[in-house]
Amino acid sequence: TYNNADDSGLHFTVEALVNGSARSCDVVLTEKNAPDNSEALTVNINITQKPKGLIECVADMRRSRCYFPFLKNGGALNSLKNGTMEALVNIQETRVSGSLSTIMGVEGKFLLRLGDVNVPWNQIQLAMQGGNRTDTKLKLSELDRWYHVAVTWDDTFAYFYIDGELLYRTGISNYSGFNLGVAYGGSESDYNRAFWIGYAYNADRFFPGYMAEVRVWNRTLTKEEINAENHFYSVPVDSEGLVGYWKLNDGAGHIIKDHSPSGNSMLGEINVHSSGGQQIGDPGMNWVEMSLP
């Protein structure tokens, strides 16, 4: 309901939403004292009111990364003979052919990313010690669009999902299980070669957009579980098999809380770049207010 206008602006009264449903209205402003022989100016404004989202903040991962300063419970991320990695991602800018963009994982061991030499820059790839896995059906074709991506695996196959649709299955050699909770040899950073979000090997392999709801499980989620109501946007923190859960919704500072029982919180860095053979950055994270779904 319109109330009045003064030098500070227009004033409306808005009632609470009923049953959480969204609503909107159009407001037309018309100039009252138009100059002689001039048509009055009009401005159309659309006002939308909707319930609070399950997600209210995300991380802009461009030239940014998340890492473990130490692992409170590294064992929870090891020996993953069965498992799932999943995240919400939103590409904000295109990259040149041959670019690599990291979602999460360990360089040279088990890494979920986009692109590669001879792989389109926006195509999902699982880079493994025993060889890389990808398929032309795994492209994230639209900019500024949220996608839920998930890779699940057992001791025989890896399964690739986009927005809950199983698009590709491929054989893998899992051996005794993948270890995401240890550091490996590698001189590309002060923190060694380990599990990162949004980074691997060098500063140019950042994710070119927003990320949220990054999760690691020690079991192979089913298609039905991935497509459960609101699973893309939130899961109970005590869910069976949830061993890593970084919502990337912290909103301030650079501590990235692990909401899973493992308690392996991360730190964020921005302005990541190469200097003297090291890949370094500044403490921080670029937070973006955004309501999802």
Language-model features: where?
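Short, solvent-exposed beta-strand-to-loop segments that form ligand-recognition rims
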Residues: D163-N192
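Extracellular glycan-recognition modules
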Residues: L54-Q125, F157-A158, Y201, R219-I226
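Localized edge beta-strand/strand-to-loop motifs within extracellular or lumenal beta-rich domains
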Residues: R145-Y159, R219
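Short, aromatic/His-centered strand-loop micro-motif at the edge of beta-sheets
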Residues: I124-H148
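Extracellular glycan-interaction patches encoded by glycine-rich segments
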Residues: Q129-G130, A183-A212, N227-V235, P293
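Extracellular, beta-strand-rich glycan-interacting domains
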Residues: G83-E93, D204-F232, V243-A252
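Surface-exposed binding patches on compact interaction domains or structured appendages
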Residues: T1-T13, N122-Q123
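Extracytoplasmic low-complexity segments
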Residues: K52-S64, G75, G171, A228-P293
